Amino acid sequence: RNHATYLRQESDPEKVELLWKVRRNVSKAVKALAKYRVSEDVAVPNSKIPETVAFVSELNRSSRLRINCWGHAGDGNIHINVMAMSDAPEEMAEIEPLLERAMRKILELGGTLTGEHGIGLAKKRYLGLEFDRPTLAAMARIKTTFDPDFRFNPGKLFPDYLFST
């Protein structure tokens, strides 16, 4: 129904373990392909997975960098990887615009900017794409209610402007 090209289900314990071994090593194998990699997890409705994969494929074709994705089809979680073959300034400068294009597309498809790893330092700059300023301000007020001294994960979720006077 979602145009899968291959599906494998196993009941043999040895074959199940082999599939898990492949799954556990995908990230390491992809990381070994490049000198520098940024991996972002996002989530989209399951019906939008094919469109997400097609978009990532198009990004890959349009860039000198390598871009790929894999994920957990059951919950729509997709890991998007942008990889530079060197640390040349022109390659490094291309990473951020590609990631922002991907984040905007994920939101356009009805997805969310984080699938399983949270916002943290890496994605807080994108929060304004998903949430408007009043929503972010409300979230910041909730945080300050429970953490008025900013002791828990300081600076890791919200843009600093939400706490300036």
Describe every region a protein language model picked out:
Residues 107-119, 144, 148-152:
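Alpha-helix capping/hinge segments and adjacent helical runs
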Residues 1-98, 105, 109:
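C-terminal substrate-recognition/cap domain of FAD-linked oxidoreductases
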Residues 55, 101, 137, 141:
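Alpha-helical scaffold segments in soluble metabolic enzymes
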Residues 90-94, 98, 119, 127-130, ...:
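Short amphipathic alpha-helical interaction segments
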Residues 8-22, 113-129, 158-162:
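Short proline/glycine- and acidic-rich turn/helix-capping motifs at secondary-structure junctions
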Residues 124-165:
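Activity-critical C-terminal alpha-helical subdomain
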Residues 40, 78-82, 117, 123, ...:
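A structural signal for short, well-ordered beta-strand segments
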Residues 31, 102-104, 116, 138, ...:
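Short, intrinsically disordered/low-complexity patches at protein termini
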